[in-house]
Amino acid sequence: MTHQTHACHMVNPSPWPLTGALSGLLMTSGLIMWFHFNSTTLLMLGLTTNMLTMYQWWRDVIRESTFQGHHTPNVQKGLRYGMILFIISEVLFFTGFFWAFYHSSLAPTPELGGCWPPTGIHPLNPLEVPLLNTSVLLASGVSITWAHHSLMEGNRNHMLQALFITIALGVYFTLLQASEYYEAPFTISDGVYGSTFFVATGFHGLHVIIGSTFLIVCFFRQLKFHFTSSHHFGFEAAAWYWHFVDVVWLFLYVSIYWWGS
């Protein structure tokens, strides 16, 4: 039997990177098939294999960290750096959308009517559903902080209550955003305004759905006593991600909904 004399986690060979890459190929190919041939078969296959890969890969990570004790303080430090770099990459991702928006709105071309919003576009009222959405996300930021502090203090019931409230607010935000899209007087094909609006807010909405899923997993893990007051990086990463989603929305609200209208 070999003995490990270092604090690093030497990961066992895994099929999930390969199946993840193949499912990504299927999804992107499926998107092209959907756009050009109106066939969703390949896309659904890609999504299904992607979901199965994520479930099994994260199941393995939970097993290694919670039940096998491989996530030493040294490993957790590396995971924290990884999460920070991931969030930085997401910031740069959204920077591109803001750049496109400000490039188009600060110096509107004659094709847009020389004004912003472009001629013929009726923007959404920033003091109606968008303001409610802002309040909902800010409240969820407070409740996720409450959950984090409750976890660090060992108060299990308060942590579960606060986490449930955060998830409920995240789902409520998604439903509000969907209703707003349904009732919007413009579409993604309405020039540069429609493109920048729906791509920026749509990708943010996707991040809210991902963040809500992340928190739901944390909720069930907490029910199974996976987290302790000193060992809960999975939840900590979800909280960081949720705060990032909050901050991006504030920039979206001020830029696109309020100033841009």
UniProtKB/Swiss-Prot annotation:
Q: What class of enzyme is it?
A: translocase
Q: Which reaction does it catalyse?
A: 4 Fe(II)-[cytochrome c] + O2 + 8 H(+)(in) = 4 Fe(III)-[cytochrome c] + 2 H2O + 4 H(+)(out)
User: This protein's superkingdom?
Assistant: Eukaryota
SUPFAM superfamilies (UniProt xref):
Cytochrome c oxidase subunit III-like (SSF81452)
Question: InterPro entries of this UniProt entry?
Answer: Cyt_c/ubiquinol_Oxase_su3 (IPR024791), Cyt_c_oxase_su3_dom (IPR033945), Cyt_c_oxidase-like_su3 (IPR000298), Cyt_c_oxidase_su3-like_sf (IPR035973), Cyt_c_oxidase_su3_a-hlx (IPR013833)
Q: What is its EC number?
A: 7.1.1.9
Note the topology in the membrane: Multi-pass membrane protein
- Membrane-crossing segments per the record: 16-34, 41-66, 73-105, 129-152, 156-183, 191-223, 233-256
Localisation per UniProt entry: Mitochondrion inner membrane
Gene3D superfamilies xref list: 1.10.287.70, Cytochrome c oxidase, subunit III, four-helix bundle
Molecular function per GO: cytochrome-c oxidase activity
Stretches of the chain found on the membrane's Mitochondrial intermembrane side: 35-40, 106-128, 184-190, 257-261
A GO biological-process term: mitochondrial electron transport, cytochrome c to oxygen
Q: PROSITE patterns, alphabetically?
A: COX3
Segments on the Mitochondrial matrix side according to the record's topology features: 1-15, 67-72, 153-155, 224-232
Name the GO cellular-component terms: mitochondrial inner membrane; respiratory chain complex IV
Q: Which UniProt keywords apply?
A: Membrane, Mitochondrion, Mitochondrion inner membrane, Translocase, Transmembrane, Transmembrane helix
Pfam families, per this entry? COX3
Oligomeric and partner information: Component of the cytochrome c oxidase (complex IV, CIV), a multisubunit enzyme composed of 14 subunits. The complex is composed of a catalytic core of 3 subunits MT-CO1, MT-CO2 and MT-CO3, encoded in the mitochondrial DNA, and 11 supernumerary subunits COX4I, COX5A, COX5B, COX6A, COX6B, COX6C, COX7A, COX7B, COX7C, COX8 and NDUFA4, which are encoded in the nuclear genome.
The role this protein plays is: Component of the cytochrome c oxidase, the last enzyme in the mitochondrial electron transport chain which drives oxidative phosphorylation. The respiratory chain contains 3 multisubunit complexes succinate dehydrogenase (complex II, CII), ubiquinol-cytochrome c oxidoreductase (cytochrome b-c1 complex, complex III, CIII) and cytochrome c oxidase (complex IV, CIV), that cooperate to transfer electrons derived from NADH and succinate to molecular oxygen, creating an electrochemical gradient over the inner membrane that drives transmembrane transport and the ATP synthase.
Give the family from UniProt: Belongs to the cytochrome c oxidase subunit 3 family.
PANTHER family, per the entry: CYTOCHROME C OXIDASE SUBUNIT 3, CYTOCHROME C OXIDASE SUBUNIT III
**Protein name as annotated:** Cytochrome c oxidase subunit 3
Organism of origin is Gazella saudiya (Saudi gazelle)
